[in-house]
Curated annotation (Swiss-Prot):
WD repeat feature ranges: 155-199, 207-249, 329-368, 372-411, 462-501, 514-553, 601-641, 767-806, 850-889
Keywords: Repeat, WD repeat
Region Disordered, residue ranges: 661-684, 1049-1089
InterPro entries tied to this protein: EF-hand-dom_pair, Quino_amine_DH_bsu, WD-EF-hand_domain, WD40/YVTN_repeat-like_dom_sf, WD40_repeat_dom_sf, WD40_rpt
Upper lineage: Eukaryota, Metazoa, Ecdysozoa, Arthropoda, Hexapoda
Highest taxon, organism lineage: Eukaryota
Low complexity: bias regions: 672-684
Pfam families per the UniProt record, alphabetical: WD40
Protein name as it appears in the record: WD repeat-containing protein on Y chromosome
Sections of the chain in a coiled coil: none
Length: 1089
């Protein structure tokens, strides 16, 4: 706010609004007003004594400055004014010791790293993935076949990050799942629960059946791996071996399966296995085992349900380290536990429904007991990097706890819905690398537990719901974002850190349940010390957002959304779906009076509004109505319609407002009437008049409704999406001071003078169906920043737009091209430039896609030239004025540090693109965000010249080839002086067989040369003729039935064939012989008959 206010208690104290406004470009603000880095303990004690010396222990503006200078803390005027406004939270311009210390405490709390760990969403917020188990019976065992271990030496442990680059789901990193059922069937699954193969298993004979197993190993292979077995008899056995060359699991030639007898292992007949037994470690069956390589300790637990026998003094979990045993005594024993080596804690759960957190080295008493389950605990695990504990009970309820504060964060009960109530014997396994909890039974269910952010897909989210309002506070130099998740978050844009988060800011009770209400509007007070927010249910709240304290509660009409709020000196204006402006007092002593209702001239819901300090207010509705109001009196003076902006519209009260005033008038007349009869008659007459007027209005409404239905599509109203006042433009007839954004993508410009009106309009989008949802400008009203419904950010140069010709200035295009790469020439005219190529004013200087969804709010920081956008895609992003991407608030990636005193952006720095925009970005967006343009000029030659050049080039190539062939003859000898075949090696090559596998890959060790096709010799003519002859061509089947009692040979004389060689005597003799043979056979057959 650039207006000057003498907000003082006495005449000696002058606080001006202009001191915190960014309109003061001449004041040097290189000095920080932060006291926390400059004050010491001795100085703080001196300040305390100075406060005690003053009457009432309160200091004014100049007094506090003198006290600070006495302890060598000196500020210039602008910085000290900013510091005093930060300290003075009571708005009385007097500072006491409590306010001073509170300011220091809140400043130190902002530096607390624990505030950065608080999540915006619930730990389990992703829907579970369910698929069939493909087993005949329920899954009884679930394991993970992994390459990387969960344990690592301390010198190799790196800081775990909360983001990933998308490669953690590979088989090498995430491993394979293995499920088994009671019939001995085993199935192998990928990390995404896709089936791979099926196998069968057989159990070996041990003294007691193994109930639980665990495996501990290091990735480097320098420490012996350990296989831990816990059986039904309470015994624990450990097999240690070296993982070098697969240890004892090397394959032997000729043996497909290696069988090991436990007695031979104990006798040392297998030197690669080192056994160790803990006989009768528990008196009940072992329920869970774990071996910590870091602590060199064994953990084993058991359940003790026989309370009469053990009387609650049972060792639920036993830790064995270097021969020493430590008993963690828990009633009813322990079903499951988890060891977090990084925190040196053990989390246990058992049949007593309690989750206990123990220090590993203090087994006598738990550090914390978490209560809330109604059934026995069957699974617990810890996420040390997120400080969260997960517990699952017998009734399939999952609870998430904070590890440090020991508070309940979430109760997840979807497993009850997904799994049948009769199915209780379930198997659980937590994949620490993928952060997934797998539940196996008749089904396989995968639940994401606080998953990492995929930075190859997104930079993260700012809110857990769409961002509705983005504000920059010039006093505290921070960004405040409000969202539809009912969160208010304070950010430090220079370091990217989150300072304060306030959850459930607007709520209401529905059937005993507290429901969060979306925040739809927000603004600061004139001194920018407090925050005003409006919600969808019509509630308003004033916040001291530095300590998350609500100062005042207000409300317009119930269940009427607040769409715009304005805070001016001593007054608060709120408007929304109630179709009128509600004014609240901001004067001490009159805050809690009834609000003032401005006249209801609007006939539809108010969608937006803005203020020109000291002059007026503009409001716009969903039906396209625009009304200008006097700020001091609250009276309207002009009314427009965006569909017919040049038509004069008379200011008339709405029918609802007229009816309300008429009823108030009759109600006021009734008590002052002379007699009861007169009052009764008057009221009766008033009711008749009301009935007549109501029936007449209903009849008119029906007729109008029929006309509207008949002409629907012709008179569809055009709604107003956003309005913006240019604060630096005067109230004259020739200055366009109000920008009105329509849902058609057009921005209209009006003059808010009493005799002014519509001046001009321009198209602000380049896609059909897009429109401008939010607008902002810089302090000198040189640039207009717009955010569209399709996620585009556009910057317009409006210095010479809608102003008198005498005030127009020269536009230096080379300077603009240096600041905005969008203006540089390209080979082809892009879509954003084609739309405005015939539009002289205003000048489009930048256009790029900043979000995938609609941009709901936009703001601008003047000194560092930073654009802030809040979108419907849950993110709030920072951009330079030229369009370079700086970062997303709440991102898990490292932040590029910025300065509030220097311009953001460096031409030599290569800026990256947001991952989600990179996949859909156009050439214009890629050029603007990256700041790079590849200049490749393309010439367009004449077609005829091109053909001639192609012919000349072809002739030249042919000539060069001929010259290469005939100009220089080949040199003899062509094949060289000699040609020698490669000789054979005199040494035999030794082949080393790989015996580490279960089979010997012989063919991989053989050198096989590629085979060549042999030349096939031609077949001689005689052989070809013999192959072609058919000696059975005369044996043809006999027609009709064949008598089986007769001769076995029935021959039918064939018809005489024409021979190619009729003159050959051999052919004649052969034919005669065949004829004789046929006659002879026939005669013999006849004689026999």
């Amino acid at each position: 706010m650039s207006a000057i206010l003498n907000a003082s208690v006495d005449s000696n104290t002058n606080i001006e609004y202009q001191t915190i406004s960014s309109t003061q470009s001449q004041i040097s603000e290189e000095q920080s007003e932060r006291l926390h880095d400059r004050i010491s303990k001795e100085q703080l004690e001196k300040l305390h004594e100075a406060f005690k010396a003053y009457p009432d222990q309160q200091l004014g503006v100049e007094e506090l400055r003198e006290v600070l200078e006495e302890v060598d803390i000196v500020f210039n005027d602008a910085v000290y004014t900013r510091l005093f406004l930060k300290i003075n939270q009571n708005h009385d311009f007097r500072v006491d010791w409590n306010e001073f210390v509170s300011y220091l405490i809140f400043g130190f709390q902002e530096e607390d790293p624990s505030s950065q760990k608080e999540s915006l969403i619930l730990p389990i917020s992703v829907p579970p993935v369910v698929r069939k188990s493909e087993h005949r019976s329920a899954v009884c065992c679930l394991a993970l076949l992994k390459v990387k271990s969960d344990q690592a030496p301390l010198e190799e442990v790196a800081e775990t990050s909360n983001f990933s680059f998308g490669g953690e789901d590979s088989p090498e990193a995430s491993g394979m799942w293995v499920t088994a059922s009671h019939e001995g069937m085993m199935k192998f699954w990928s990390s995404h629960m896709e089936p791979i193969r099926t196998a069968s298993s057989e159990s070996s004979n041990l003294p007691h059946a193994v109930y639980v197993m665990s495996y501990a190993f290091y990735n480097n292979g320098k420490v012996h791996s350990k296989l831990i077995l816990g059986d039904y008899g309470g015994n624990v056995r450990i097999l240690s071996y070296s993982p070098h060359l697969r240890g004892p699991f090397q394959a032997k030639p000729g043996a497909a399966l290696i069988e090991v007898v436990w007695s031979d292992v104990l006798k040392g007949k297998i030197p690669l296995l080192i056994p160790k037994e803990y006989i009768n470690l528990h008196s009940e069956l072992i329920s869970c085992v774990y071996y910590s390589l870091h602590m060199n300790a064994l953990f084993a637990s058991a359940e003790y349900r026989n309370t009469k026998k053990y009387r609650g003094r049972c060792p639920g979990i036993i830790m064995v380290s270097y021969g020493d045993k430590s008993n963690f005594r828990i009633p009813l024993g322990v079903t499951t536990f988890f060891v977090a080596e990084s925190h040196n804690i053990v989390v246990t759960g058992g049949p007593d429904t309690f989750v206990r957190i123990w220090d590993v080295y203090i087994p006598t008493e738990p550090s914390a007991i978490l209560t809330g389950h109604n059934g026995g605990i069957v699974m617990v695990f810890v996420q040390p990097e997120e400080n969260k504990v997960y517990s699952v009970d017998y009734q399939k309820i999952i609870k998430v706890w904070n590890l440090q504060e020991h508070t309940l964060l979430q109760t997840y009960g979807d497993l009850v819905r997904l799994i049948h109530h009769t199915e209780t014997d379930l198997t659980y396994y937590y994949h620490s690398h993928l952060r997934e909890l797998i539940v196996a039974g008749r089904k396989l269910i995968s639940i994401k537990c606080c998953p990492r952010v995929r930075v190859d897909l997104t930079d993260g989210n700012t809110h857990a719901a769409p961002v509705s309002v983005v504000l920059y506070n010039r006093l505290f130099r921070n960004i405040v974002t409000c969202g539809l998740d009912s969160y208010i978050i304070v950010w430090d844009p220079w370091t990217g850190r989150r300072k304060i988060i306030m959850k459930s800011c607007h709520t209401k009770m529905i059937y005993g349940e507290t429901i969060d209400i979306e925040i739809t509007a927000a603004c600061f007070d004139p001194l920018e010390q407090f925050l005003l927010t409006g919600a969808r249910d019509g509630s308003l709240k004033i916040w001291n957002y530095n300590n998350a304290v609500v100062i005042r509660n207000m409300s317009i009409q119930p269940d009427q959304e607040v769409t715009a709020v304005i805070w001016v000196v001593e007054r608060i204006l709120a408007m929304g779906w109630d179709r009128q402006v509600t004014e609240f007092n901001d004067v001490e002593g009159r805050e809690y009076g009834d609000p003032k209702k401005w006249p209801k001239f609007h006939t539809d819901d108010i969608t937006c509004g803005d203020v020109k300090l000291g002059e007026g207010v503009v409001t716009a509705t969903y039906s396209g109505e625009i009304i200008f109001w006097k700020l001091e009196t609250g009276q309207p003076y002009r009314r427009y319609s965006v569909m017919e902006p040049k038509r004069f519209i008379e200011l008339k009260l709405s029918d609802e407002e007229k009816q309300m005033k008429r009823s108030k008038r009759w109600a006021s007349r009734a008590p002052h009437s002379g007699s009861h009869m007169m009052s009764h008659t008057g009221s009766h007459m008033g009711s008749n008049v009301d009935q007549m007027s109501g029936s007449r209005s209903r009849g008119l409404a029906i007729l109008q409704g029929q006309e509207e239905i008949r002409e629907y599509g012709v008179n569809v109203p055009i709604s107003v999406q956003a309005v913006l006042f240019l604060q630096n433009r005067p109230q004259t007839l020739h200055h366009g001071s109000v920008f009105i954004s329509l849902d058609t993508g057009i921005i209209q410009v009006y003059s808010h003078h009493q005799r002014g009106g519509y001046m001009n309009e321009f198209l602000a989008v380049h896609k059909t169906g897009d429109c401008v949802l939010t607008m902002a400008t810089d302090r000198k009203n040189r640039f207009l920043f717009t955010g569209t419904a399709f996620g585009y950010i556009k910057v317009w140069y409006i210095v010479n737009y809608c102003i008198p010709e005498a005030e127009k200035i020269h536009v230096c295009m080379p300077r603009l091209r240096l600041d905005f790469i969008f203006l540089r020439k390209e080979t082809f005219l892009t879509r954003a430039k084609r739309v405005v190529r015939n539009q002289a004013e205003p000048l489009l200087v930048s256009s790029y896609k900043g979000h995938l969804k609609a941009i709901n709010s936009i703001s601008f920081i003047n000194l560092p030239k930073i654009i802030i956008t809040g979108s419907h895609d849950y993110s709030c992003r920072l951009w330079t004025q030229g369009g370079r991407y700086l970062g997303t608030l709440g991102s898990v990636l490292p932040w590029t540090k910025l300065s509030p005193f220097e311009r953001a952006g460096d031409d030599t720095h290569v800026y990256r693109l947001p991952p989600d925009i990179k996949k859909v970005a156009s050439s214009t967006t890629l050029k603007v965000i990256s700041g790079l343009q590849v200049d490749r000029p393309m010439k367009r030659p004449d077609k005829a010249k091109t053909e001639e050049k192609e012919e000349d080039t072809a002739q030249a190539l042919e000539t060069n080839d001929l010259k290469k062939l005939f100009d220089r003859p080949l040199k003899d000898p062509i094949l060289g002086k000699h040609f020698q075949l490669p000789g054979r090696s005199a040494l035999d090559q030794r082949i080393d067989l790989d015996t580490t596998q279960s089979y010997i890959p012989v063919y991989t060790n053989l050198k096989v040369h590629p085979s060549e096709e042999l030349e096939r010799l031609p077949t001689p003519a005689v052989i070809s003729r013999v192959q072609a002859e058919n000696y059975l061509h005369q044996y043809l089947p006999v027609e009709g039935k064949v008598d089986l009692n007769d001769s076995a040979l029935n021959i039918k004389l064939p018809s005489r064939r024409r021979s190619d060689r009729t003159n050959d005597p051999r052919n004649m003799r052969t034919a005669k012989t065949r004829g004789d043979m046929g006659l002879g056979h026939r005669s013999s057959h006849t004689s026999q008959n």
